[in-house]
From Swiss-Prot:
Identification of the protein by name: Protein MGF 110-4L
Induction notes from the record: Expressed in the early phase of the viral replicative cycle.
Keywords on record: Early protein, Glycoprotein, Signal, Virion
Keyword Signal: yes
InterPro entries documented for this protein: ASFV_fam_110
Signal peptide: 1-18
Glycosylation sites: N64
Role of this protein: Causes the redistribution of lumenal ER protein to an enlarged ERGIC compartment.
Source taxonomy: Viruses, Varidnaviria, Bamfordvirae, Nucleocytoviricota, Pokkesviricetes
Amino acid sequence: MLVIFLGILGLLANQVLGLPTQAEGHLRSTDNPPQEELGYWCTYMESCKFCWECEHGICKNKVNRSMPWIIENSYLTSCEVSRWYNQCTYDEGNGHYHVMDCSNPVPHNRPHRLGRKIYEKEDL
């Protein structure tokens, strides 16, 4: 009985103190995923803003250096990503979601590439 009481007390303390209660491997919804996971998240949805470093309207991809520089426009979306068990989710914030099996990922880049404008030196 004492063990059960202490277990419940520990769970309540975690909730009050805001400590994570999720098991290792889960990722709560965020628009700033861990740096070491950018390679994964930015491969399957490269239009997320957290994948790009922009300065003066010109953006370069943080992960894939071979990607062309682009002009900052509506191609870049404010994504939130999350992982729960083996379910990876991209929330584009406008009611559009891309959900995939984390161990069998499916890219969701094509619909967004239509809005991408590649930077040309003449654009200055």
